[in-house]
Amino acid sequence: MNIFPAIDLINGKCVRLEKGDFNKTTTYELEPKDVAKAYQQAGAEFIHVVDLDGAKKGQTCQFETIQKIRENCNMTLQVGGGVKDFETIEKLLEIGVDRVVIGSLAVKDIALTKKFFEKYGAEKIVLALDVFIKNGVPYIATHGWQESSTTTLDEILQTYLGDGLEYVLCTDISRDGMLQGPNFELYRIYSSIYPDVQFMASGGVGSLEDLEILKEQNTYGVIIGKALYENKFTLQEALEC
């Protein structure tokens, strides 16, 4: 299983939100580029960066910070937050981003998102599908989790399978930033229904036991954020799982 340490950015600083709530923000006095370098030195091969300002505004804006992260590490770098157009994707790829994460746009503008797959290839595109569970069904939440939709996770996955959909980062927003364990059932079920899709688990990881369960379920990858900042375990320990 691939470990993706996460860096969430607001105004150039590392932060964590609780349940995606911009009013419940913890800011860490750490330089993002230094955090990235430390992750690489610990042995990480992947890193996940989110421009939360971009997610909220609907336009990626922290290019300079992202570029500094790129210059300080050679890990596979995936970046999301407000990616809405070709220009933004071009700029991110230009500064060395390996995979671009498409969030609410994948629900709001399917035609444009399909064009991204066509132009850049499925290996460059990660769909970030944030879900809330209602009556046992995962529905999509959009726009930095500030809106909820009536679209189900299944509907979106089916929409993009024909485009070669390869990577899906799926977050149960009720778990995010809570350190109370991810939604194991969600990843287990969807990994078995869609064996050709590489699912990245996100939200709620708070212990090494959580990682071991996800690994046993053959989850492709897991995003780890707050657990590292709060020293629940070290990145080395996570990588050794």
Swiss-Prot record:
Catalyzed reactions per annotation: 1-(5-phospho-beta-D-ribosyl)-5-[(5-phospho-beta-D-ribosylamino)methylideneamino]imidazole-4-carboxamide = 5-[(5-phospho-1-deoxy-D-ribulos-1-ylimino)methylamino]-1-(5-phospho-beta-D-ribosyl)imidazole-4-carboxamide
Gene3D superfamilies: Aldolase class I
Subcellular locations according to the entry: Cytoplasm
E.C. code: 5.3.1.16
Isomerase in keyword set: yes
A GO molecular-function descriptor: 1-(5-phosphoribosyl)-5-[(5-phosphoribosylamino)methylideneamino]imidazole-4-carboxamide isomerase activity
Alphabetically ordered keywords of this record: Amino-acid biosynthesis, Cytoplasm, Histidine biosynthesis, Isomerase
Primary residence: cytoplasm
PANTHER family, alphabetized: 1-(5-PHOSPHORIBOSYL)-5-[(5-PHOSPHORIBOSYLAMINO)METHYLIDENEAMINO] IMIDAZOLE-4-CARBOXAMIDE ISOMERASE
Similarity section: Belongs to the HisA/HisF family.
Protein name per the record: 1-(5-phosphoribosyl)-5-[(5-phosphoribosylamino)methylideneamino] imidazole-4-carboxamide isomerase
Organism expressing this protein natively: Francisella philomiragia subsp. philomiragia (strain ATCC 25017 / CCUG 19701 / FSC 153 / O#319-036)
